[in-house]
């Protein structure tokens, strides 16, 4: 059983009134249990760190495992919060500064924004933070279980109905009846805000260089840019963990390059070099080109 399924099986049935502190304790305890029972997964973290020339000592492996667990806490958190409570949580814990200014400007002008995110830091907080600040979002993702998919969609509707958040629509890759590429293209044509990952392999990915290794990346964002004919903004967005449930959102617009996917990956590389333990993808099988 994967870590995601292990945690969801135990926690999605909890009372929705479970407080954030209790939820966090339960996620961390469940994750620690899983890692104890699956030593090969700790070895995977170490192997992936060293494959990229990053520190692979026990302290770093412990930190990486802890950050993987926090990813699931941040993913589940909105399911256990009322809209007002989650809005207050984000306002109190997320520092956004002027990171949203360019996106807000593009939204007012009806210009499409491609918000490229990676498996780094508290990525699960990016979309709700955009929605909190009035940006309607279409988010491309995969839900590991139908139960989580249904719960997330229902909660997104509740959040939008509350007036605290702009609407969030999920484009679920691999869901029966969903042609994700066509739906992503439709968002771009409408001048919407599309949030999509760029550091994983799909049929549309291209080879890029990351930390001295050739990997697959982009997940089709370069194709969407060509479809938009330059009438869009592309930015890399990162939600860095800065402390105990404190976060900083940064966005970096990508312009003036013929290789936008490589430019995105270079932004990710800087973040990973600074905080390798926050790169969630260390938990996965890295999409090396040579493999």
Regions found by a protein language model. Give the residues of each.
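Short acidic-hydrophobic, aromatic-tinged amphipathic segments that line or gate anion-handling sites
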Residues: 94-98, 168-176, 255
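Membrane-anchoring hydrophobic helices of lipid-metabolizing enzymes
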Residues: 1-117, 122, 159
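Catalytic core of membrane glycerolipid acyltransferases/transacylases, capturing the structured
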Residues: 111-174
